[in-house]
């Protein structure tokens, strides 16, 4: 399984996803500024991975300060420093709720440590570092549970009596988008491990091509039977009875309290197609992605990306992969002067979602045809 995030003894390295799948290069992240730019520039992406890298970037910076004895001994000063850095990191990707959620949780950790009698600046920093490391470990555990829960649900509700299923996924939600294993792609991995996956299909996911560059890369790496399609081929794929897609499984950057889901642009279109073709549509996400403070999708801020992502494309020159020197080039593909609208995400209404796969189980709509996600947090749902 791919490892996109490496953290050991205060040293953080991430796999530069802008160069994948042609070049595998790990880049060091030593400061919060390094982490902020890596997230903003999409060298790392995927809601869980963004949160983990942001927290570990600050952990790496704090480790360096502790080791060089440059950290204030005042717990209040260290707490304030951490709080300001967390606020800065959250601005790198505002749509992904995991980042803000992680910042709130770790801010609470350092605040509690600061209030403890006799605490020191060193202890406050150490508490943050440990909490960030623990967060990474828990994410991996949660992902494997999500994969298992989703695979079990699909076998019961979407297989239609078949021993194997075909699944379509969108964007990248695997090891490259999380601490490891993945959310929606984790469901695909779990199906493959259980020998119940007939075939996986992935969209290229324009305009940033996370599907063709990253998901396809992971599927090939893990030797999972898979086929790449363009985004515009999805309807034809679902209509093809010979293919027989059983379910569409996607990730999420934010799930509102009513189940409305913000995810990579194109997700909404897939949900509409799934409803028309009678294909199950599932969202796979840890509970940290569910924002009970956001009532519906109308309240979610959608990030607008640069026009250049649509009007140009990056990759090596054809044939250069046969050499040791691979240079990533940018090629223009649109008419000069054309206006561009480039939202990074869209909102899929809860009414189009058949189930939300979490680490504690799969939530379905109630008798009133609405999601009641509060039970995921008070233990009443499962």
From Swiss-Prot:
Role according to the record: Catalyzes the interconversion of methylthioribose-1-phosphate (MTR-1-P) into methylthioribulose-1-phosphate (MTRu-1-P).
Provenance organism: Penicillium rubens (strain ATCC 28089 / DSM 1075 / NRRL 1951 / Wisconsin 54-1255)
HAMAP family: Salvage_MtnA (MF_01678)
Keyword Nucleus: yes
Segments passing through the bilayer: none
Protein name: Methylthioribose-1-phosphate isomerase
Protein family according to the UniProt entry: Belongs to the eIF-2B alpha/beta/delta subunits family. MtnA subfamily.
Gene: mri1
Chemical reaction(s) catalysed: 5-(methylsulfanyl)-alpha-D-ribose 1-phosphate = 5-(methylsulfanyl)-D-ribulose 1-phosphate
Pathway: Amino-acid biosynthesis; L-methionine biosynthesis via salvage pathway; L-methionine from S-methyl-5-thio-alpha-D-ribose 1-phosphate: step 1/6
Biological process annotations from GO: L-methionine salvage from methylthioadenosine
Residues the UniProt record annotates as site (Transition state stabilizer): 171
